[in-house]
Amino acid sequence: ALCGVSYQNQIGVDLECIRTMPDLESLARRFFSPEEYEHLCLISSEEQKQMFFRYWTCKEAYVKATGDGLVKLEEIKISLTKNQPSRLLVSGDWNLRELTPTDNFAAAVVVAGKNINLHCWEYSAFVDY
């Protein structure tokens, strides 16, 4: 599970298990920007799974923060480049952070505002429930 709490700012989180999806390419074509889709098509199928869920969790965390729902995900552009932090390419002041909670999972947190101090803690007390 993943939980996000903010006292003053809009916040959205998403967590997904990285898994094989037979319709991954068609979902990417439908919900990703042309640049994101092209980026996905240029990498190996194993890398595609991971990249797909990285894009997906970033987009979904953003729409959860804004409350806009899954409409027009292709208009929410994400920059995922090697050796640089992921970035939201949308209007307004939004902070995006990708998380890697465990192997085979992708997660993202999006918070509204500038100069946000984001703190993450792992709490495993619920594991036995």
Where are these regions (language model features)?
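Core catalytic alpha/beta fold that binds nucleotide/phospho-ligands
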Residues: 1-129
